């Protein structure tokens, strides 16, 4: 999930349904992944300098999403793991000891089989791996959980996006419960996987002290958090909704004041 404007290759309004299935990415198709875009030089999406790979498709419909062009499944540029890694390694000289690749979306876990192949081959090349996810697809049930366990063996750092700590408010904001997202956070703590928490601060929605305190208290129960990032809500992706001819849900919401961002940081950093 980026905090910068992405590209808009074009998305039909019919693509905005919240019904997304992992079945679209079945095993026979896993030699290639559906890629939304790549960026060669990322400095905020994981440790060090990163080559960023944004996979296509997302089950969430976050009201503040600035990349609705990444929602639809089964579209995008089809790339193999080796093609992406060959491209990434052109920039390896910039990575230093901490850099590598970060895979985001959309929601990267929608293409977990391709992601497994990509990270497996990255490790064979000695490339550091980072996963940026909302974890909405997480479950401890088969077959997903066995794949996720293996994925975590291949993942150095997880950037976990927690949209809202309150389940009812989370449903309003994203059309989905946060129960499995919070369970994923617990699981990552259980296996001691390094995690960066990301939380978008939206005036009137996620910036209430009550919710920030609840989020802080939840994060305080985890033992693997390396960083907590408060991302101020912005409107940089509104033009995409205009191009699509659909209403932007938060058109009357302005970015948070600096004081509210500082307040959120003061509260959430107490969890570290």
Where are these regions (language model features)?
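N-terminal polybasic/positive-inside topogenic patches
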Residues: 15-24
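Conserved alpha-helical substructure of the radical SAM core
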Residues: 68-101
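Short glycine-enriched, charge-decorated loop/helix-capping segments at active-site entrances
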Residues: 69-73, 171-177, 245-253
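N-terminal basic, low-structured, amphipathic or hydrophobic segments
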Residues: 2-10, 19
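Canonical Radical SAM [4Fe-4S] cluster-binding loop centered on the CxxxCxxC motif
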Residues: 31, 37-79
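Auxiliary Fe-S-binding modules of radical SAM enzymes
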Residues: 24-44, 196, 201-272
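Conserved AdoMet/S-adenosylmethionine-binding subsite of the radical SAM
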Residues: 89-93, 97-100, 105, 109-231, ...
